[in-house]
From Swiss-Prot:
Assembly description: Component of the eukaryotic translation initiation factor 3 (eIF-3) complex.
Keyword field: Cytoplasm, Initiation factor, Protein biosynthesis
The protein's name in its UniProt record: Eukaryotic translation initiation factor 3 subunit E
GO terms under biological process: formation of cytoplasmic translation initiation complex; translational initiation
Organism: Caenorhabditis briggsae
Family matches, as CDD domains: eIF3E (cd21378)
GO molecular function: translation initiation factor activity
Record-stated family: Belongs to the eIF-3 subunit E family.
InterPro entries: eIF3e, PCI_dom, WH_DNA-bd_sf
Domain PCI: 100-280
A Pfam family hit: PCI
Amino acid sequence: MFTVDMVDTLFKYSKFMYECGNYTVASVCLYYYRNLVNQADPNYLNALYGKLASEILLQEWEHARDDLLKLRAYIDANPFDTEWELVTQRAWLMHWALFVYYNYPKGRDEIIEMFLNQQPYLNAIQVLAPHLLRYLAVAVVTSKSRQKNSLKDLVKVIDIERHSYKDPVTDFLTCLYIKYDFDEAQEMLQKCEEVLSNDFFLTAVLGDFRESARLLIFEMFCRIHQCITIEMLARRLNMSQEEAERWIVDLIRTYRIEGAKIDSKLGQVVMGVKSVSIHEQVMENTKRLTLRAQQIALQLEKGRQDKVKAN
């Protein structure tokens, strides 16, 4: 007969195996423990984190992703006593997610979906973990499938937070999309390379980031100036004019740079101007106000919790 004491022993044994470095056994034991107890069990959350940690250390990224999603579902069900505890757990979950998503195929797209597109998690970043904006920014810049649709929303968030948090990655996007300072953007890109090469999670995506960032600079430069000579680009790229023209053609075709055209007769790259409707402007400003209002609400909740603890 299987008793409650046996279940407790299974949890303690799992913890012991984990601390001994036997992550395979710990993972198996925690899998059974998680299925034997209900979510009201006091060790249920610990078991979820323990199973996730074991799979990360085993570098079993498929299993780790499944465990991350189970942990997220539990946290989103909000079994906590206060709203502040829920926000804190979401912040911790995003830190753990970095281990998984920066090693999982298409994981960077899932970072965008979780960190940027899910408002409760974006709120947690703004209030408790603005340093996660670096990892979100790198994910957006290097994502070929989501960059175009996500970049505008990311820049809005960075613009809101730039007075309270900045690093070379967010500063690069600030220079490019808010200040329109291309010289400073180039300087920040060099600093980004140094930062990424020393970042545990980002060092493997340095090449992708460098390439994508240069393309963003090229696209924005052409948009601002609307017209740029191929000869000037050739000098900057250290290419012949013919090589530069082929490079630009491949660039436009591969990355589908909106509105870009080459006038071979005049030797120019011409960028079409896209007008923004009044409706789009209203929607963008409304979204910005909503982000700010939610951030203020969470900061007030944090202040209330701090006051309760002080008393």
